[in-house]
Regions:
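Electropositive phosphate-/nucleotide-binding environments in soluble metabolic enzymes
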Residues: 1-2, 32, 91-98, 138-145, ...
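Active-site core of metal-dependent hydrolases
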Residues: 1-125, 133-134
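Flexible, glycine-rich phosphate/dinucleotide-binding loops
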Residues: 61, 86, 123, 172, ...
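Alpha-helix boundary recognition
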Residues: 71-72, 152, 186, 204
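His/Asp/Glu-enriched, well-ordered alpha-helical/loop segment
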Residues: 106-186, 190-193
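C-terminal cap of metal-dependent C-N hydrolases
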Residues: 182-223
Length: 223
């Protein structure tokens, strides 16, 4: 516990000195303690709840309910996108992202207090239809748009609200001051979507067209 407090305090001071967010991005597991350690720090020290961004909050239903309580106290929470949630729902207790966001909103949580991430292209277990572990895949960044589409098409949330979870909210929380908005002085990062399907039509990164008419124009990792 003391080491965790020290890490949180050091990150906070480092953020202040460097002009960066200085938050702790906490990867949560399946354990029954949920967010207990984070909540203890918030209640027993002067470190604010905004110092933490717990992720994987939708990995099971009991962890998600704990995350709802955490968000009620002003905490920000991060969902992990999953392009194969239809299969995962059959064999795990994972909470579908769009369902979780609807639940947060119905609980009175601010639309500013949640984000969606892909786990940074991290490892993602693969299972057979019977639930047997088959190996590791990759948590794809494309899951972000998929989750936004489900928020709109499955839960009928306004597009502008769903987009906050992958644009302005993470930019604000991480203090990425040139990201998250289309405005003078911001990076020219824009995605154009087909009106009905919300599939990608055009991608512009820092003013450069990367995808046009759904066809990539830039393919190299470092281009």
């Amino acid at each position: 516990y003391e080491e965790f407090v020290r890490l949180a305090a050091d990150a906070r001071v480092g953020g202040m000195l460097s002009g960066k967010a200085g938050i702790l991005n906490i990867h949560l597991g399946d354990g029954a303690r949920h967010l207990d350690l984070i909540e203890r720090v918030v209640h027993e020290t002067e470190i604010p709840v905004t110092q933490f961004l717990p992720t994987h909050i939708n990995r099971n239903s009991h962890l998600f309910e704990a995350a709802v309580s955490f968000a009620r106290e002003g905490g920000c929470v991060d969902f992990t996108g999953n392009e194969d949630i239809d299969s995962w729902e059959k064999i795990t207790d994972e909470v579908r992202v769009c369902t979780g966001i609807r639940r947060l909103l119905d609980a009175g949580i601010s639309e500013n207090n949640f984000t969606i991430s892909s786990d940074g292209q991290g490892s993602l277990p693969r299972f057979s239809p019977s639930g047997q572990y088959e190996g590791l895949g990759i948590g794809k960044a494309s899951s972000l748009l998929k989750e936004v589409r489900e928020c709109v098409m499955r839960e009928h949330l306004p597009l502008e609200l769903a987009l906050r979870a992958v644009t302005s909210n993470p930019a604000r929380i991480l203090k990425l001051n040139t990201k998250g908005h289309i405005a003078p002085g911001y990076d020219g990062d824009i995605c154009l979507l087909h009106k009905d399907s919300l599939l990608l039509h055009t991608v512009i990164a820092k003013g450069r067209v990367m995808v046009r008419n759904s066809v990539p124009e830039v393919r190299g990792t470092f281009e």
